[in-house]
């Protein structure tokens, strides 16, 4: 297992033909789980509208129950070409066993959204829904980067000097030393490639 191989694989994963095409078009397609979270779909729809009203280089694909989502959208003014509703009949609740939910609820907003990424119909998937279902779906549907054994959760934490990446923050309760090394390498690559931080420092909490 090498840092160089992970870096190469990561860059290949984000530099697909679809991403290059998207960059040429200057539009990033984000599939958003409109049914995930405590205040769905209202806050999710509001966030999508705020996002597209603030910039022209993204398109939000709101994944959820079409009639409910469209009802929320009616109260806002936004560029119509930048928001699209993708129907998903089912919702995965937080209390549901993640593996069973992903297997059985094929028409849930989480499964539909992740399949859109897998099928190159979206460039990213965002959800505030069941963390367990998102982790399971990420492995089963989207798949892991080669050489990575466990998917971590990695929120950005505000600090006095900017932001830090906390990885992992609860996805794995029995991580081995090798997993921690993988998390550290992924976190370093993310902070450098996405956040623009040169030579990021890695610490153990």
Feature names for model-found ranges:
Residues 10-140, 192-203:
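Contiguous, glycine/small-aliphatic-enriched amphipathic segments in soluble metabolic enzymes
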Residues 90-92, 160, 173:
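Residue-level detector of flexible, active-site-proximal loop/helix-junction positions
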Residues 112-116, 150-157, 187-193:
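Short, charged beta->alpha transition segments
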Residues 136-170:
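Short, acidic/small-residue loops that bind anionic groups at enzyme active sites
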Residues 165-203:
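Ligand-binding beta-strand-loop-alpha-helix segment within the catalytic cores
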């Amino acid at each position: 297992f090498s840092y160089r191989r992970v870096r190469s694989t990561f860059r290949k994963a984000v530099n697909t033909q679809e991403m290059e095409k998207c960059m040429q078009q200057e539009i990033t397609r984000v599939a958003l789980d409109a049914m995930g979270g405590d205040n769905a779909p209202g806050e999710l729809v509001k966030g999508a509208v705020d996002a597209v009203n603030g910039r022209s280089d993204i398109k939000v694909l709101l994944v959820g129950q079409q009639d409910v989502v469209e009802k929320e959208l009616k109260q806002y003014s936004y560029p119509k070409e930048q928001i699209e509703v993708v129907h998903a009949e089912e919702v995965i609740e937080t209390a549901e066993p993640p593996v069973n939910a992903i297997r059985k609820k094929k028409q849930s907003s989480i499964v539909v959204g992740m399949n859109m990424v897998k099928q190159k119909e979206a460039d990213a998937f965002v959800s505030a829904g069941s963390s367990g279902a998102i982790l399971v779906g990420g492995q089963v549907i989207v798949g892991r980067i080669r050489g990575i054994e466990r998917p971590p959760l990695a929120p950005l934490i505000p600090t006095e000097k900017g932001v830090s990446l906390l990885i992992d923050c609860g996805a794995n309760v029995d991580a081995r030393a090798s997993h921690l090394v993988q998390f550290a390498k992924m976190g370093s690559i993310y902070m450098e490639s996405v956040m623009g931080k040169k030579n990021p420092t890695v610490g153990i909490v």
